[in-house]
């Protein structure tokens, strides 16, 4: 279910199809927020590693955010730069301090993570499914290793 919902959300974002995007991200937001964040974060991290094998500079992170916001604004004017920053930062392992409230909802994550994924896929001329499959495999392996 998560795989299909995320694939639909990313495909709608790539196509700039507002109606399909809203439907897909509403479905994605109805799923377990921790799992959605884990999977989409793993996809984002892999994409960033592939597209920037020597690491990301601050300017490159800013370029991703600006490019993503600029492209999405035309068909999704609700795009929130703060949510993009938090999604991208989370994928890179940068999280708000635990004493600070997280200023985004699970719906914000469900909407903004696919926007960033779609932007990176388009920029790198990549397909979503291989990244999703690899992320799901890594997560399943990590969970299996955590079992007693």
Regions found by a protein language model. Give the residues of each.
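Helix-rich alpha-solenoid scaffolding regions
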Residues: 52-66
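Alpha-helical rod/repeat scaffolding segments in eukaryotic adaptors/tethers
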Residues: 21-33, 54, 58, 99-106, ...
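Glycine-rich, aromatic-bearing surface loops/beta-hairpins
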Residues: 118-148
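N-terminal interaction modules that seed assembly of large macromolecular complexes
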Residues: 12, 16-55
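Amphipathic alpha-helical repeat scaffolds
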Residues: 7-11, 117-118
